[in-house]
């Protein structure tokens, strides 16, 4: 099968062996794959896949099931989207059937490629790990990102007011239209976020020099969940604030989690999140789609840090 590899900072559409479909797995003919920052890092040689995972780029995809392994309840022809440790940017992918969800009602097959990674990330980190309670206030750094877009909608759906930090006035307006209460543009004074706080939960893909600010913004017994290091891996912290406020600093990753952990997470998504699409309370937010032949342009678009929502790579538009 053809698949997208990251080679010396470039992407190449190359031939790869077709993976076997074993017990409990399904084979998906891929329609589209969502781009994530991990793909940028892997392409640059900075983020290798976990042991045993495919070297092919792509942590999420959508498509049509073409083969079902023994023990799986899926059917050939089912339209689905899936969370992957790698391999999504290919003509087909084999995945644990428990890491697959149906394309939600009212969502196209191409749009569905933008859902698994961001909604799994937000549900895991905000609702499970940080144990967000009704009415608690949330701060989302990089609020116009794919993860931010999902988090804003979930906060609104579950009755939690949220605020954002973003890169431009246009992206702030985008977040407010999705349901954010407000926020700040990072080129302005980030300290002004204190006017909206303190915050019970902070979802932080930035780290770096945002760390000291987060401690100032965190409420008593607040939870600061670190999911990325776009701003750097080093920070200077006033540990007295951690003690005084009883702050929980929670580091979190998803890609390297084991199969059972992801299966349990997807069971929760199926029960608590996926029905909200049919109710019109959640919707995919696509910034732009690119055909696979323009993969370099798609990666450049994501790397520009100017998009609002998700960038999606279309692998086979005949399936849609």
Stretches with model-predicted labels:
Residues 41, 79-142:
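NAD(P)H dinucleotide-binding glycine-rich loop of Rossmann-like/cofactor-binding domains
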Residues 18-34, 46-87:
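Glycine-rich beta-strand-centered segment in the early N-terminal region that forms part
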Residues 140, 156-210, 262-264:
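Adenosine-nucleotide cofactor-binding segment
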Residues 1, 279-285, 296-320:
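C-terminal capping/lid region of NAD(P)-dependent oxidoreductase domains
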Residues 158, 166, 209-281, 314-320:
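Glycine-rich phosphate-binding loop and adjacent beta-alpha segment
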Residues 119-120, 145-149, 208:
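Glycine-rich NAD(P) Rossmann-fold beta1-alpha1 loop
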């Amino acid at each position: 099968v053809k698949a997208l590899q990251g080679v010396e900072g470039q992407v190449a559409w190359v031939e790869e062996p077709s993976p076997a479909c074993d017990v409990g797995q399904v084979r998906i003919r891929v329609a589209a794959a969502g781009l994530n920052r991990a793909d940028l890092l892997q392409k640059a040689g900075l983020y290798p896949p976990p042991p045993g995972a495919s070297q092919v780029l792509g942590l999420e995809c959508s498509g049509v099931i073409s083969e079902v392994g023994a023990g799986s309840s899926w059917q050939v022809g089912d339209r689905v989207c899936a969370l992957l440790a790698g391999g999504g940017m290919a003509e087909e992918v084999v995945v644990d059937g428990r890491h697959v969800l149906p394309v939600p009602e009212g969502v196209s097959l191409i749009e569905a490629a933008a859902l698994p990674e961001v909604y799994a990330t937000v549900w895991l980190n905000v609702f499970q790990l940080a144990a967000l309670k009704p009415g608690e206030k949330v701060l989302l750094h990089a609020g116009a990102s794919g993860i931010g877009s999902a988090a804003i909608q979930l906060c609104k759906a579950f009755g939690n007011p949220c605020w954002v930090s973003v890169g431009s006035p246009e992206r702030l307006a985008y977040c407010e239209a999705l349901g954010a209460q407000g926020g700040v543009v990072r080129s302005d004074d980030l300290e002004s976020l204190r006017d909206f706080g303190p915050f019970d939960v902070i979802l932080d893909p930035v780290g770096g020099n945002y760390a000291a600010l987060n401690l100032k913004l965190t409420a008593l017994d607040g939870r600061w969940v670190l999911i990325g290091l776009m701003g750097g891996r080093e920070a200077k912290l006033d540990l007295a604030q951690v003690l005084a406020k009883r702050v929980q600093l929670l580091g979190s990753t998803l890609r390297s989690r084991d199969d059972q952990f992801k299966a349990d997470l997807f069971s929760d998504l199926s029960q608590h999140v996926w029905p909200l699409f049919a109710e019109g309370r959640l919707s995919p937010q696509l910034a732009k789609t690119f055909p696979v032949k323009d993969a370099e342009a798609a990666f450049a678009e994501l790397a520009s840090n100017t998009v609002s929502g998700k960038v999606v790579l279309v692998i086979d538009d005949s399936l849609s």
